[in-house]
Amino acid sequence: MKSIKRYSLLALFLFLLPLSQSHGADRVTLSSTNPTAFEIDHVVAKEKGFFAKENLDVEVNYMTPDLVVKALIAGTVDIARSGSHFGLIAAARGAEIKIIGGSNYGYPYQVIGNPQFKSLNDLKGQKIAGASLASITTTIFKDVMQRRGIPPSAYTLLFVGGSPERFQAVASGQVAASLAEAPPFNFKSIEAGRKVLLNYSDEIKNLQYTAFFASNKSLAQNRSLFTRFVRAIGQGMRWVNDPANEKAAIELMVQRLKIDEGIAAQTYRFMIPENKAFRGEGIVDGAGLAEMIRLLAADNMISERKPWETFVDPAFMPTAK
């Protein structure tokens, strides 16, 4: 009799086990660049419980920008948060990936030069620090300069690397200016007496600078999972955009980005009220994506200027309900 009861209890336990496990959070792996103010959207979504509310356990794998989309294509992550250009270029070359949401909106960078330079026109005949020929920062700078009537032949680009290297090149006098600076290096430059020659936000009104990508295969298998992810991201952006959360957002930047409170406060003001870098709250910006496609086609980084809708999963179109 005891044996029958024991087996009955065991059978009941095995029957209930899958039911209890089904209530566990769905695990999602996300590739992203090393955390800066640009990545605060998914940091907030995790820290403030928005992923948890959507029953998601999101593991973030940080890597260099050029590897983020490659990890998605290789199938080692579920979602990539990447510069839109990396994903668009890959998709244009045949990668089976689609955009499912927006991350950074606009282009929160500045052109910063040494004190003797007062405007972009003053950069004619000068050396300007850039990241690389293939960098989207180079593409955007050349486009803005061309629209100002200053062709690439009028200045020399010296490719030195990322923001720290560009900052140092300007500080040493090796170059006249850096073609793109963002927090905290723009603040450090201004404090040192250097001049802001351009706020890109004055020139570029719509740009889907970064976005979230997923593979076509994964989307077909579990589109609702990605819908929950984007919804949580949107809630995170809504939280960071709320002025009532300014102090808490600054504290989160201090903790997670390992920066001091003064820089964090400057960064918050620059990214949120001034540049509204998360204004789309996860929704794909069609006009901003079209602008990115235009930039890439104009610089021969993609062969064809296709409609922006081509690159977005149908369920995540701005008008999709």
Predicted regions mapped to residue ranges:
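Short amphipathic alpha-helical segments at helix boundaries and their inter-helical linkers
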Residues: 77-82, 171-172, 270-286, 318-321
